[in-house]
Amino acid sequence: IQMIFQDPYSSLNPRMLVKDIIKEPLDINTDLSTIEKNEKVNWLLDKVGLSSEQATRYPHEFSGGQRQRIGIARSLATEPEIIIADEPVSALDVSIQAQIINLMMDLQEEFNLSIIFIAHDLSVVKHISDRIGVMYNGELVEINKTDDIFDNPSHDYTKELLRAIPQPDPTGREERKKERLSIN
């Protein structure tokens, strides 16, 4: 199991080079030679869309999206079966969010990963998830296939979350307003 954190800057040691950040889990958990570790670091950088030339830079020299790619590369270093991604795109611009989400989905398929994707943005959750668990007050209150959660939620809190999603279509606005008022 590995982790991808919400804030890529605070989760990366600012005094370490990118290559050392990605290599650290390999130093701790593998018996690879130095050459093999360096080759794997370069391979991981390539997998997340960064170049091996960037390995000798520090985290502050990268954008938020690039730093998140470094965090993703670090999480893949030990070839985990499961990655816990805690709000991995919430601190990023919308255009960068899409790139990171698509990268994670590609890596999930390529490496046969299970990703526990923790998020508040239901549009992101719907896009990336096969199954969704809904938490309320620290308790898992509903878990189901993504389509079932969105089409036929069973828990009241899940229903309330789905009703809170902004709807760009103004034609149904009055109906949704009546529905919200009938709950209260």
Tell me the role of every PLM-derived stretch.
Residues 35-53, 162-163:
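Conserved ABC ATPase "signature" region
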Residues 58-62, 66:
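Conserved ABC ATPase signature
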Residues 72, 100:
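Hydrophobic anchor residue at the start of the ABC signature
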Residues 77-81:
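A short, proline-enriched helix->beta-strand linker immediately N-terminal to the Walker B motif
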Residues 145-184:
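Short catalytic/signature loops enriched in Gly
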